[in-house]
Amino acid sequence: MTDITPEQTQPAKPARPRGRLTRWWDSDVAWSFRHSPVAIVATFVVAVMSLAALLAPWIAPYHPFDPATLNLLDGFTPPMQENQFTGNVFWLGTDDQGRDIFSAILYGSRISLFVGISAVLFAMTLGVTLGLIAGYVGGWIDTLIMRVADVQLSFPSILIALLVFGIARGFIPPAYRADMAIWVLIVSIGLSDWVQYARTVRGATLVERSKDYVQAARLIGVPSGLIMLRHVLPNVLGPVLVIATIGLALAIITEATLSFLGVGVPPTQPSLGTLIRIGQGFLFSGEWWIILFPSIALLALALAVNLLGDWMRDALNPKLR
């Protein structure tokens, strides 16, 4: 007969619970990300450009919008060439005022990203709130919100943003318009993009409110606001994150368009769109680098964010898993 040792009779140690990061790494979304070269490259581009924009005051060779650091003799210096008057060399060249294009892109990206992210957060907050109310309450409130959304959808987003921007500036005293320009721009872009969030959340809320867990919460007397925030909202956020990612690229392009038209951020705080507008005046005079490099930066940022949003849409779609 085989003897049983005390070690063999001891119960097995329970497995350690996996951390949240480990569970995410083993999820279908993480697996899709690891096997998607497009998503990896897009994430890398967005991360590098965002980090460079955030650290612009420390990594930019010059402060391109400080008059004390500008030298007109450096104007129109081609990329990687020595200026014949000052002997300075600029990686991406300079504009007519002697501003370093590389430094201007870093500072301009900060404004573009700040406006884009803030506008998306504003539009998402407004759209999700109205969509939850419309889908959960229903009745004439649902009809009113959706009819307003339908009317707004009949106009281009850029036109809505221009209209809101012009009306808002009319109520701001001239002395404060420059300081409030960025915030007015954020609200204008946000008000032009809230509809898609509201329609998506409303549709998902209509499905969720008829489920048993919502009906049970109603029966035990949970307030409607608490049901929407604690039970319905977490289950409708998946599509919202996808819309927000794609909407960030749209918000950045909208901001650049408005700034290119001269109705965006003030000249003292130029974005990528403002830099493109400055370079447009020298496009046919031989100084091609003034418009080329800001345009490439805007294209790379918007394209990377858009590709990341496309991947997220496919990764979160259960039908494609």
Positions of the model-derived regions?
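Alpha-helical transmembrane segments of integral membrane proteins
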Residues: 97-321
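Short linear motifs in intrinsically disordered
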Residues: 21-22, 79-83, 249
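N-terminal signal-anchor/first transmembrane alpha helix
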Residues: 3, 15-68, 145-148, 236
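Short, membrane-interfacial amphipathic segments enriched in basic
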Residues: 10-30, 87-102, 134-138, 225-229, ...
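Hydrophobic alpha-helical transmembrane segments of membrane transport/permease proteins
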Residues: 3-4, 44, 52-93, 261-269
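N-terminal acidic, proline/glycine-rich, low-complexity intrinsically disordered segments
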Residues: 1-9
